[in-house]
Amino acid sequence: MTIYHFVGIKGTGMSALAQVLHDMKCVVQGSDYDKRFFTQEALEARGIPIFPFSAQNIRENMVVIAGNAFPDTHEEIVAARELGVPVIRYHQFLGDFLQKFTSIAVTGAHGKTSTTGLLAHVMQGAKPTSYLIGDGSGKGREGSEYFVFEACEYRRHFLAYSPDYAIMTNIDFDHPDYFANIEDVFSAFQQMAWQVKKGIIACGDDEYLQKIQAKVPVVFYGFGEDNDFQARNIVKTPEGTSFDVFVRHTFFASFHIPRYGDHNVLNALAVIALCHYEGIDVNIIQERLKTFPGVKRRFHEKMLGSQVLIDDYAHHPTEIRATIEAARQKYPERQIVAIFQPHTYTRTQTFLDEFAESLSLADAVYLCDIFSSAREHQGKLSIEDLRAKIEGAKLLDEEQVDVLKQHDNAVLIFMGAGDIQKFQEKYEQSVHV
């Protein structure tokens, strides 16, 4: 009996893949650091064992799936090679695995996770569908016809995939520790486009995606007149967003989503276009769009006394802007307070002015110290460099979070890709004391 052992099982993609294999009746286990991570809940709910890192975890009857954050010198990977146990990197394993299904990759600088989650939710209403989402969620269904998965451009990992379809949400300059500039990012997406086997659904409002070439049909969606799928007559309320969809200038149907901001209309349009292409009944699409519960760490709301607390993964200026605008749509009468933890020195340095500009859309700004990634050690700048560019911005220390209590009846948005959640947790504890 083969055991699939995940080195770094708490990673968002790794956790999701482990869940998919477990659901498909594979024997799964993994190892990681002791520190608690939000992906653990789903693993623990399935009874998937999680061990501390140790060479002793590796046995001969295993296939080792290695997370991208761990080098070949990691003790478990070394032990596996010494035993002659296969070691497969996450994206390579996934690339082979998805060949069993009609596969749909969702990629783009922003909106990948929300769009993957939404597509999986809608498709499940029509066909047996398995999915892997970048928020750490995965679901495997035996006999699945479709496999919906998030494909990340970082280090060109998505080139390990040759999907049947690709949804491309946008192209933007991110991951400056790897990509040289926007042209470098575009070249990665162009390489990915050549590998798609049936069709590409791309946002036609994005100037770079308009230039994408492919061997398969490219269907464009967006707000602009030239798109194959166009959203018109958009109505935004505190309850959500309604819009009409026109397919090549002919009315198709009306839709409502309990979501906020233009970016969520675009995400829904991408899903509508893909489902239309695959012949899924419009009534199913309409109903499923209304019932989408959202994905983890994307505009996740909770009430705390008179305040609304929102947890969001936004870590790029474009995402911060979209999140603040979404909060304004839902809570037009409330003060919007941004609490932001920059993620990586490289990204903070590269987008310093853009971060200042997007955060300034909030009514008040608090900044937490820069969270450095496993890939970097230290940077030349400090959080003070960003604070100096935002009028009235204050630095927030984990031990002084109760200063947020002064924002009565406000919306507090905790944003970042590091461990910003610990600030929110500390604040919630301080309120309950």
UniProtKB/Swiss-Prot annotation:
Catalysed transformations (reactions): UDP-N-acetyl-alpha-D-muramate + L-alanine + ATP = UDP-N-acetyl-alpha-D-muramoyl-L-alanine + ADP + phosphate + H(+)
GO CC, alphabetical: cytoplasm
Residues the entry annotates as binding ATP: G108, A109, H110, G111, K112, T113, S114
Pathway(s) served: Cell wall biogenesis; peptidoglycan biosynthesis
Compartmental location: Cytoplasm
Organism superkingdom: Bacteria
Enzyme class: ligase
Record's keyword terms, sorted: ATP-binding, Cell cycle, Cell division, Cell shape, Cell wall biogenesis/degradation, Cytoplasm, Ligase, Nucleotide-binding, Peptidoglycan synthesis
GO molecular function: ATP binding; UDP-N-acetylmuramate-L-alanine ligase activity
Function per UniProt: Cell wall formation.
Homology family: Belongs to the MurCDEF family.
HAMAP family per record: MurC
Designated name of the protein: UDP-N-acetylmuramate--L-alanine ligase
Native organism: Anoxybacillus flavithermus (strain DSM 21510 / WK1)
Gene name per UniProt: murC
